[in-house]
Amino acid sequence: MTFKKIAILSASVLALSTFAVSVTESPSTHVVYAAKSKLKTRIAVPKGYTADLIEDWCDSPNSKKLTRKLKRLSRRGMLSNKFYDRRKADKRKVNLANLSNHDQYELSQYALTLINSIRTQLGLPKFTYTASAQGFANDIAKAYNEDNWSDYESHDISAINNIAKMHGLTHAGDNEYEDLAGFDMTTGHQYATIYQVKQGIYYNIKQFAFGGFRYHNWKESDKQNLNYYTEWYHANDLFTGDYSQEFALSLSYLIQDPTNKVNKITSSHYIHVDPENIEKKVLYEK
């Protein structure tokens, strides 16, 4: 099994247009990353990369000066951070179409650790995992499956807002809660090892943080090309804001072509909830 493609789409109102950022990073490129002398599950932020800089770019996305600076910093971040998980020998397989509660929790905590490693370096409060956010995330993934929807179609805005209403959250018609990513499965089944799924999550979050990086020639050398770092709306969603949000991750699984059952799409839903968006606590915490 290999991970072929990852697509990311922002929760930011300014990034709701349909687009996909396609990348590939084979397991052979995932070498151990050493933070100083200690191995960690983390993503290191380049010096000079700040929350203020991200916010400034979102306020002025046409600024050539800001864009040039963020492109260079993002390239540095993409090149210097490599996937590492101390449980590489763990070949336990998970059902991408039906994660157990244990798998959901483990993957959410893994994503949260990476996100908070960046937020901490930027001087921001950590996000927190809650069962309420997990329930919300799971229902969004279920709705994607029911709508035959994936990250290829951008956000399922209608579903997100309907589920938000069910969970007692504000639902103004925009996407306030989801950063969407995904990876194609090149094998003909719906199982992957937990290690492989974490590879996809790690790469998604690097993309979110560092310019929505996308491959064009499917080569590692693409990371050197500044033209492939194009936006920081995802970074604005996850790596700015001097307040905490509740967080959870869910996966949805779609057979893109039912006639041959080969092209499998796993969409990953990075769900974050601002406590101020909780209108009916009794529904959200049920």
Question: What are the residue ranges of the model-derived segments?
Answer:
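Short, well-ordered surface patches within globular domains
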Residues: 37, 42-176, 235, 242-252, ...
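Generic hydrophobic alpha-helical segments
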Residues: 7, 17, 22, 126, ...
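A generic "functional-site adjacency" signal
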Residues: 28, 113, 131, 225-228
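Contiguous hydrophobic segments
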Residues: 12-15, 143-156, 182, 187-188, ...
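Active-site signature of cysteine proteases
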Residues: 286
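A well-ordered secondary-structure block
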Residues: 33-62, 66, 162-283
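Intrinsic disorder/low-structure terminal segments
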Residues: 2, 18, 148-151, 209, ...
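Gram-positive Sec-dependent secretion signals
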Residues: 1-36
